[in-house]
């Protein structure tokens, strides 16, 4: 082989190796960003929620805007719907629905915490339609006794800064997918289920002080600790998180 042929061959080989490495790296990046890599139950999130993995965490990114109508949308918005629920004491809160960017990092392999930390005010998890869950207290850290009258026909309402959320059963979801189905996850990585299990309504007496229990579900046939929505205080979550909570930024 001549010197010229050797040089050409060497350059060609280097280019081929470089292209292969670039293709592999590109493929790795693409694979890491696909929803198919997250645990199966997370793939039940709607298209409004972006899914990715960051180390040992599932990352959920959402705007908090519901995929159903509400009197809290502007009256000129196609998503506006006057209140048509069953609460005769309904009184619209002074707020509306604006997009609020949430980035939640949730443990992919949740485990029971040594000590159950209290849930904070504000977002404590995310429903399947990208609307955040809040705990059983209002913005002044008081019971929801009065604020319940401001919940729309799907049981949501906005904060004074226009961040829509659920404190109680998200009726649009339970009516659409069923009362015994997965509704979302709390920040500690444990799932939230509707108010029905085994063909009967769940009551607070069926649950522990954190508002959950261990058991099999359709998404976790081997069993997992899970929270339940009920129709009585504390509605969604009790004395704190069962596991160690991840983080939320907005």
Could you tell me what each predicted segment is?
Residues 1-11:
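Bacterial N-terminal signal peptides that target proteins for export
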Residues 95-97, 152-162, 210-223:
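Short, low-complexity cationic-aromatic patches
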């Amino acid at each position: 082989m001549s010197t010229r042929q050797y040089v050409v061959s060497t350059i060609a080989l280097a280019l081929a190796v470089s292209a292969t490495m670039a293709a592999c790296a590109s493929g790795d990046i693409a694979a890491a960003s696909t929803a198919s890599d997250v645990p199966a139950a997370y793939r039940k999130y709607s298209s409004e929620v972006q899914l990715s993995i960051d180390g040992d965490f599932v990352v959920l990114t959402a705007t908090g805007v519901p995929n159903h109508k509400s009197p809290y949308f502007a009256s000129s918005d196609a998503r506006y719907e006057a209140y048509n629920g069953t609460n005769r004491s309904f009184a619209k809160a002074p707020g509306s629905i604006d997009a609020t960017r949430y980035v939640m990092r949730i443990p992919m392999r949740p485990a029971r915490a040594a000590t159950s930390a209290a849930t904070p005010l504000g977002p404590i998890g995310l429903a399947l339609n990208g609307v955040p869950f809040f705990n059983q207290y209002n913005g002044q850290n008081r019971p929801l006794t009065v604020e319940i009258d401001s919940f729309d026909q799907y049981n949501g309402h906005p904060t004074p800064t226009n961040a829509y959320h659920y404190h109680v059963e998200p009726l649009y979801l339970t009516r659409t997918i069923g009362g015994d189905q997965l509704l979302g996850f709390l920040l500690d990585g444990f799932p939230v289920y509707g108010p029905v299990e085994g063909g009967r309504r769940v009551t607070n007496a069926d649950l522990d002080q954190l508002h959950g229990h261990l058991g099999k579900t359709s998404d976790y046939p081997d069993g997992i600790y899970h929270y339940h929505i009920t129709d009585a205080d504390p509605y969604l979550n009790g004395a704190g998180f069962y596991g160690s909570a991840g983080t939320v930024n907005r």
